[in-house]
Amino acid sequence: MREIVHIQAGQCGNQIGSKFWEVISDEQGVDPPDIPGDSDLQLERINVYYNEATGGRYVPAILMDLEPGTMDSVRAGPYGQIFRPDNFVFGQTGAGNNWAKGHYTEGPELIDSVLDVVRKEAESCDCLQGFQIAHSLGGGTGSGMGTLLISKIREEYPDRMMMTFSVIPSPKVSDTVVEPYNTTLSVHQLVENADEVMCIGNEALYDICLPTLKLTTPTFGHETLVSAVMSGVTCCLRFPGQLNSDLRKLAVNLIPFPRLHFFLVGFAPLTSRGSQQYRALTVPELTQQMFDAKNMMAASDPAHGRYLTASAMFRGRMSTKEVDEQMLNVQNKNSSYFVEWIPNNIKSSVCDIPPKGLKMSATFIGNNTAIQEMFKRVSEQFTAMFRRKAFLHWYTGEGMDEMEFTEAESNMNDLVSEYQQYQDATVEEEGEFDEEEDVEQY
């Protein structure tokens, strides 16, 4: 069975990650008392995320943080028992929102013990498919130490997939002033070392939580939303499905150029907890919701860019034919939003088991050039501070060089212009609506 090793780093990563395990355990039928589900569908691929230990306990992830606080609350939580105690790796100092501490000073002291646990988990796999890391890019541990871990794992397992769920900070919902620094330095690493990055914007979650889920503070809503997406992205891996059944297939279908592996993710239906049982959704409704900018988890409007590729994962009992028709329908009606030099660029898959409490749902992953808006915004904030060298002493004090900041900045700007280049790729034919005739002339 092709396993995925799950790692959660830093406070945000651990909050999202532990919620993810609650959702997954619920679906796979692993209760807190550790009795695995009895239906064959639940058990068939349970090993993708779980490994069996003595007494039939199913023990998943690796948790790491530079301070013990979050770990303690995870351990005390309802699912704290399903984690193996030696998979909690934590320091005592904390990174204090400082990327340099996570990456260069505090992080490296802890990294070897994390890698030992990673090795131990990887060795117990029959056929390791890859790693998934949940972290945020705005803090110190998830961003600094998270990217350090990613590069170390890259060295040791160069041919395994590396997927990250990265929470990208936003100007509206900001925890720390130095977020632009931390984010830019992290993106610099993720461009080089990750295979697939699911970008989750803080601000977008805020916007979703407010109107649709009727939550005023995005705390509970956050993790639930993100874990809905994580569970949707990985449901093909956990339950028998028809298409995109592993991380590598996902990557092959979604990444036309190696550096452009930052994805927008969305989820449908988004309803508040109370109102979800009153209406059944149809496949067309799901499709429409799924492509709606309001359902995107990153603060980029897909309408401002074009889709290079996209992948839609439907869950529940529905006809595959209907799904395919809907997908074609979307492409035909909105052809200007899809680049015409990649024909059939939406992949769809259907998995028979819907998430808990819903008849059917859809998870959407899109490689859209509009994601550059998010990087642009961070980059502008970065430049504003870096020009005055504000807060820089915290980083240089940990042994960093200004050169590294300049490199990270230009790497991120390159990324933005690459997205822009492919967005404009066939700008001549855009003028009229008779694109088809134009294409024939060229």
UniProtKB/Swiss-Prot annotation:
Amino acids binding GTP: 11, 67, 136, 140-142, 202
Keyword Manganese: no
Known cofactor(s): Mg(2+)
Pfam families on file: Tubulin, Tubulin_C
GO biological-process terms attached to the record: microtubule-based process
Entry annotated with the keyword ATP-binding: no
Major site of localization recorded for this protein: cytoplasm
Residues spanning the signal sequence: none
Keyword vocabulary terms for this entry: Cytoplasm, Cytoskeleton, GTP-binding, Magnesium, Metal-binding, Microtubule, Nucleotide-binding
Intrachain S-S bonds: none
GO molecular-function term, one example from the UniProt record: structural constituent of cytoskeleton
Role, per record: Tubulin is the major constituent of microtubules, a cylinder consisting of laterally associated linear protofilaments composed of alpha- and beta-tubulin heterodimers. Microtubules grow by the addition of GTP-tubulin dimers to the microtubule end, where a stabilizing cap forms. Below the cap, tubulin dimers are in GDP-bound state, owing to GTPase activity of alpha-tubulin.
Family as reported in the entry's similarity comment: Belongs to the tubulin family.
Protein name (database record): Tubulin beta chain
Lineage: Eukaryota, Discoba, Euglenozoa, Euglenida, Spirocuta
